[in-house]
């Protein structure tokens, strides 16, 4: 005890070296902090470089610019059925007309999905007895039909052929058609075309249980000289959304 006390009081005695334990503890923490900072900077640079690449890739995807986007009400581009297919909600039907003869009245349809051109997914069904397509779930649907005809008697027959879509329950007391199409046939002459084609489609709000039937009407002068082209006259629909955009016609509002 006396030796330690004397050495500490002697001004000429050399000072003991500073303890290194604290410096050894500080140095590793400084290195770790520096490494973490470098890693954070590297990660930030990687994110910065990746963001422009992701945006550029999204813009470059084929067809993305042309695909329609669901807006309010009638702005849904009903004249672009191919684009609306991008929006369909898994419910799709396409039926093919059975009879080729131009007989006025409700059309009968092939509904077996195993047949060419026929599709019928869950939530949709066809009633043979009433010749109607039945919708099980409410929503906004794009409904369409296509009419194709061919001349079977050369140089004869003109006029027009019409299709009209009717809904049950009825839209109104008058029972106006929800969708209509008229195809004018070329005149009976040697230069006339021997085929005719028409397409019509529309967005409709359909209720659960809604039934859709198509009626054919032909002018008498065309009935014997023209027929439906086999497999080319179709009725179809697909659901775009279960929501009802403002301003869209409903089954009971017209």
Swiss-Prot record:
The chain crosses the membrane at residues 29-49. One of its GO terms (biological process) is positive regulation of cytotoxic T cell differentiation. Pfam families: TNF. Keywords: Cytokine, Membrane, Signal-anchor, Transmembrane, Transmembrane helix. It is a single-pass type II membrane protein. GO terms for cellular component: extracellular space; plasma membrane. Signal peptide: none annotated. Expressed in brain, placenta, lung, skeletal muscle and kidney. It is found in: Membrane. Its main location: membrane. Belongs to the tumor necrosis factor family. Cytokine that binds to TNFRSF9. Induces the proliferation of activated peripheral blood T-cells. May have a role in activation-induced cell death (AICD). May play a role in cognate interactions between T-cells and B-cells/macrophages. This is Tumor necrosis factor ligand superfamily member 9.
